[in-house]
């Protein structure tokens, strides 16, 4: 029995899809515990590149059952477009299951999200405009639509009517937009009901019974620690808890059943959208990391902001999540750059901070304190063991491990599934 959580340790785009793809072939279930189609991940299988958004990467595994958990928000149009796109390429998504308690994104959620961002102007958060935040807001306000509501049209209509009593006031009186018709929303949801119903399960019961029977579960977190609504760079965050604790809540698997918490972290740092980023680069090295690392968002097509490795964030993420292991990705991108700066602390208005500053104001004022290490020139993309890495690459990895306070058990040396050095396999305990 293994219950493994995969969590992004930075601001997303760390390579969680690759980690999940590698581990997904060794487990019985792969579950997405949070988020929606607002964050994408890329998986390379057999030389084929797949860009997934709402679906767990485990959908590409031949054996694992992929599940969208109760902590997710599901845009049905996006879900079935993604399924159809995969199946058109020969993939089999028939094993996919959806928690009956997952929240559904309604057309009015998307409308409110987009108009609200435009309304904020320069103060905009930089959301993807896919209705994720408004859907989570309705969830905690207890007026959300759940997947199980599609099983009873009368309940579905009643909930939509109740929600639109409020939403139309917002759209018409605040944002000067037209009111949303109840029948249109009901018809929208019912158009997907027949396809969705066979997928619905009591995910919490099924997953816990699977663990009782000695089976293995992998929880694939979306977004990342620094985008967590409680622990991230608020307000420039997502609307859920993409951390270890959030994975437990988003699946119904209790924390005492977790056998490994695997943090995914790049050998440098990236971020998409607005918000503070102490090690961000605006020179040729930022452009180099962006170009060489292929740093363009899967979901938005936006170029990612790039910077050097930030060990303050790495230590913080280790503590917040209780990581047992790190999966270091994109080490190959740093080949041949001469010297590699590592942020070991911050200077905040003349005061050294070895840990995350307490306030966001301080974090906005943080400037990195660097130490440098020599880079390597050798091609590492075919290295299969840690010992095969050049000595300078080994030294860099060891230093990151020391600074993060967590062992590095996997090292990505290229985009392919087989371009991964495995030091300690968490799927095997």
Swiss-Prot record:
One GO MF term, please? GTP binding
- Which reaction(s) does the protein catalyse, per the Swiss-Prot or TrEMBL entry? IMP + L-aspartate + GTP = N(6)-(1,2-dicarboxyethyl)-AMP + GDP + phosphate + 2 H(+)
User: What GO cellular component entries does it have?
Assistant: cytoplasm
Please name the top-level EC class of this enzyme: ligase
Q: How is the cofactor bound?
A: Binds 1 Mg(2+) ion per subunit.
Which example biological process does GO assign this protein? 'de novo' AMP biosynthetic process
Q: Which residues bind substrate?
A: 298-304
Chief localisation class: cytoplasm
Q: Which residues bind GTP?
A: 12-18, 40-42, 304, 330-332, 412-414
EC number annotated for this UniProt entry = 6.3.4.4
Q: Where is the active site?
A: 13, 41
UniProt binding sites for Mg(2+): 13, 40
Q: Which cofactor does it need?
A: Mg(2+)
Query: Which residues are involved in binding IMP?
Result: 13-16, 38-41, 128, 142, 223, 238, 302
* PROSITE patterns reported for this sequence: ADENYLOSUCCIN_SYN_1, ADENYLOSUCCIN_SYN_2
Question: Which pathway does this polypeptide act in?
Answer: Purine metabolism; AMP biosynthesis via de novo pathway; AMP from IMP: step 1/2
Question: Where in or outside the cell is it found?
Answer: Cytoplasm
Which keywords fit this entry according to its UniProt record?
Answer: Cytoplasm, GTP-binding, Ligase, Magnesium, Metal-binding, Nucleotide-binding, Purine biosynthesis
A Pfam family recorded for this sequence = Adenylsucc_synt
Q: What does this protein do?
A: Plays an important role in the de novo pathway of purine nucleotide biosynthesis. Catalyzes the first committed step in the biosynthesis of AMP from IMP.
Q: Which family does it belong to?
A: Belongs to the adenylosuccinate synthetase family.
Assembly, per entry: Homodimer.
Name used for this protein in its record: Adenylosuccinate synthetase
Native species = Corynebacterium jeikeium (strain K411)
The coding gene here is purA
């Amino acid at each position: 029995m293994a219950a493994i959580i995969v969590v992004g340790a930075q601001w997303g785009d760390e390579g969680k899809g690759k980690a999940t793809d590698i581990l997904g072939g060794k487990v019985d279930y792969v579950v997405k515990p949070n988020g929606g189609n607002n964050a994408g991940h890329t998986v390379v299988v057999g030389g084929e590149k797949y860009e997934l958004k709402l679906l767990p990467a485990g959908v590409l595994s031949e054996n694992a059952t992929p599940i969208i958990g109760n902590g997710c928000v599901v845009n049905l149009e996006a879900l079935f477009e993604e399924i159809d796109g995969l199946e058109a390429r020969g993939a089999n998504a028939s094993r996919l299951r959806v928690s009956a308690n997952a929240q559904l994104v309604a057309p009015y959620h998307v409308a409110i999200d987009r108009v609200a961002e435009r309304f904020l102007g320069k103060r905009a958060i930089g959301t993807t405009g896919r209705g994720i935040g408004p859907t989570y807001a309705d969830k905690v306000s207890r007026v959300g639509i759940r997947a199980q509501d599609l099983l009873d049209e009368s309940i579905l209509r009643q909930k939509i009517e109740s929600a639109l009593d409020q939403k139309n006031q917002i759209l018409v009186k605040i944002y000067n937009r037209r009111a949303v018709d109840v029948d249109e929303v009901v018809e929208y949801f019912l158009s997907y009901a027949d396809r969705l119903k066979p997928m619905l399960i009591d995910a919490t019961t099924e997953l816990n019974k699977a663990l009782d029977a000695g089976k293995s579960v992998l929880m694939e977190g979306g977004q990342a620690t620094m985008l967590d609504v409680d622990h991230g760079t608020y307000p420039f965050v997502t609307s859920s808890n993409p951390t270890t604790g959030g994975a437990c809540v988003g699946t119904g698997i209790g924390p005492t059943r977790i056998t490994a918490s695997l943090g995914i972290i790049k050998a440098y740092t990236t971020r998409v959208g607005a918000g503070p980023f102490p090690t961000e680069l605006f020179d040729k090295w930022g452009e180099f990391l962006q170009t060489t690392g292929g740093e363009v968002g899967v979901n938005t097509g936006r170029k990612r902001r790039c910077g050097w490795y930030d060990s303050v964030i790495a230590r913080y993420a280790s503590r917040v999540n209780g990581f047992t292991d790190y999966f270091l990705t994109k080490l190959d991108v740093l080949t041949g750059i001469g010297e590699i700066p590592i942020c070991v602390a911050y200077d905040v208005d003349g005061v050294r901070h070895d840990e995350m500053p307490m306030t966001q104001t301080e974090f906005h004022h943080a400037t990195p304190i660097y130490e440098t290490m020599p880079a390597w020139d050798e091609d590492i993309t075919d290295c299969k063991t840690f010992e095969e890495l050049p000595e300078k690459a080994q030294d860099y990895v060891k230093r990151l491990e020391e600074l993060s306070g967590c062992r590095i058990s996997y090292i990505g040396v290229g985009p392919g599934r087989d371009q991964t050095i495995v030091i300690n396999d968490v799927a095997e305990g």
